[in-house]
């Protein structure tokens, strides 16, 4: 019986977290209240306080409970094409899948909360994603899939700007966003395969890339 009670308590806690995500997106983190979260979860305010000390702790639980689609793990055996396709799939998930979209909206639109929790979580997700991209591109270079003199740092900087724009537009508008994301990321990959001069690095940097082989 005790085990069932613990399971029910965990189920209630998760319902509160899921409800809080929706309320934070709809009302904004600063304006959301525990009463609103409780009503959305179908529980009493007391039940919320039984699991959490306050709204800040609820927010912490929301941010810790989810992995953003763009927090990818690089697997060399997956191959370059499939590794890049994973980026496309993750981007589509981030702006279309209901809960992933809500989490994206929290990280992007609510990032200036006074606690700094959302900003820190956004930085964590961004750093992990950019690390993945760096691993994919570096592996592609060492495997001969991309030019040996490709400037990885500049390429990733350009890519970061592209992804930021796609996320903002993808969350804001539904019109042909899936197609735009596919075309934009496919075009960037084609650009990396035959990069213009300003995406190429000097000979000294090429030697540094070779050292990773």
From Swiss-Prot:
Membrane spanning stretches: none
Molecular function per GO: DNA-binding transcription factor activity; transcription cis-regulatory region binding
Domain named HTH tetR-type: residues: 10-70
Superkingdom of the source species: Bacteria
Residue spans binding DNA: 33-52
Family annotation (InterPro entries): DNA-bd_HTH_TetR-type_CS, Homeodomain-like_sf, HTH-type_TetR-like_transc_reg, HTH_TetR, Tet_transcr_reg_TetR-rel_C_sf
Species annotation: Pseudomonas putida
Record flagged with keyword Transcription regulation: yes
Function summary: In conjunction with SrpS represses the srpABC operon.
Name assigned to this protein: HTH-type transcriptional regulator SrpR
SUPFAM superfamilies registered for this protein in UniProt: Homeodomain-like, Tetracyclin repressor-like, C-terminal domain
Keyword vocabulary terms for this entry: DNA-binding, Repressor, Transcription, Transcription regulation
Keyword Transmembrane carried by entry: no
């Amino acid at each position: 019986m005790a085990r069932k009670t613990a399971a029910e308590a965990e189920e209630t806690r998760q319902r509160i977290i899921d409800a809080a995500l929706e309320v934070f997106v709809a009302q904004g983190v600063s304006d959301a209240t525990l009463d609103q979260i409780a009503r959305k979860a179908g529980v009493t305010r007391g039940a919320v306080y039984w699991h959490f000390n306050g709204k800040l702790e609820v927010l912490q639980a929301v941010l810790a409970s989810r992995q953003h689609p763009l927090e990818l793990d690089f697997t060399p055996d997956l191959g370059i094409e499939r590794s890049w396709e994973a980026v496309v799939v993750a981007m589509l998930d981030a702006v279309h899948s209901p809960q992933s979209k809500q989490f994206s909206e929290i990280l992007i639109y609510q990032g200036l909360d006074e606690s700094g929790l959302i900003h820190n979580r956004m930085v964590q997700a961004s750093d992990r994603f950019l690390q993945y991209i760096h691993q994919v591109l570096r592996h592609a270079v060492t495997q001969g899939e991309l030019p040996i003199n490709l400037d990885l740092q500049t390429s990733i900087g350009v890519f970061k700007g592209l992804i930021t724009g796609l996320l903002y537009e993808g969350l804001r508008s539904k019109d042909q966003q899936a197609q735009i994301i596919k075309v934009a990321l496919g075009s960037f990959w084609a650009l990396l395969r035959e990069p213009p001069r300003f995406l190429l690095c000097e000979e000294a940097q090429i030697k540094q890339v070779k050292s990773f082989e």
